[in-house]
């Protein structure tokens, strides 16, 4: 078994060329040539340096472990966005458009981890998938905020080519992924609040 990490554009081409059997991606990125098996839903979060003045404007959200910060307040800020090859970029652009955010500067990064690290260093603000947030830790504090999971949350799926019959190992891998995802997404929504991280 080979596990490969990459951007959406590369992984989609590799699946189409039969270089990959399965891909994990957002439901919104599934094409008509793919079948998809749902794994779970993750929030799409704002990330700010721990000492950023906008942190004072956050408000608690009932039922969420993340406070809400109005993205409109990001106007004038340096904002880290993913490259256009990353599926997250479409969500980031939708948020900026929906909230009429006028960034002071836009800095493009090749992955969320780098963007989050630059935010931790106080060089700007950005966005991050909740699944990344759960696994990334920095010596400098950052704050995470929900925006609106019903509009920007991402259904995560495992997909495969529609014209491929699943082999026994592929079915077994999908079942293992579903089991792991159930446990993982349960932890995302039941672990302690990062409000005071």
Explain the meaning of each model-derived region:
Residues 1-32, 108-109:
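Central regulatory/effector-binding core of bacterial HTH transcription factors
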Residues 31-38, 42, 66, 113-163:
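Beta-alpha-beta core module
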Residues 49-53, 162-164:
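Short loop segments at secondary-structure junctions
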Residues 56, 62-99, 166-174, 183-185:
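Secondary-structure junction motif
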Residues 189-196:
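Conserved small/polar residues in nucleotide/adenosyl-binding loops
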């Amino acid at each position: 078994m080979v596990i490969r990490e990459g951007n959406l554009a590369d992984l989609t081409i590799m699946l189409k060329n039969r270089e990959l059997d399965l891909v994990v991606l957002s439901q919104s990125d599934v094409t008509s040539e793919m079948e998809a098996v749902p794994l779970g839903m993750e929030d799409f979060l704002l990330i700010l340096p721990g000492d950023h003045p906008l942190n004072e404007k956050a408000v608690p959200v009932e039922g969420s472990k993340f406070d809400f910060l109005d993205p409109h307040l990001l106007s004038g800020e340096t904002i880290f966005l993913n490259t256009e090859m990353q599926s997250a970029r479409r969500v980031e652009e939708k948020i900026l458009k929906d909230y009429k955010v006028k960034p002071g500067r836009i800095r493009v990064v090749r992955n969320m981890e780098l963007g989050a690290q630059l935010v931790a260093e106080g060089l700007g603000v950005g966005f991050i998938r909740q699944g990344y947030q759960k696994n990334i830790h920095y010596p400098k504090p950052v704050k995470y905020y929900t925006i609106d999971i019903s509009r920007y949350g991402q259904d995560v799926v495992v997909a495969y080519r529609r014209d491929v019959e699943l082999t026994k190992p592929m079915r077994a891998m999908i079942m293992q992924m579903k089991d792991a995802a159930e446990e993982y997404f349960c932890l995302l929504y039941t672990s302690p609040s990062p409000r005071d991280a």
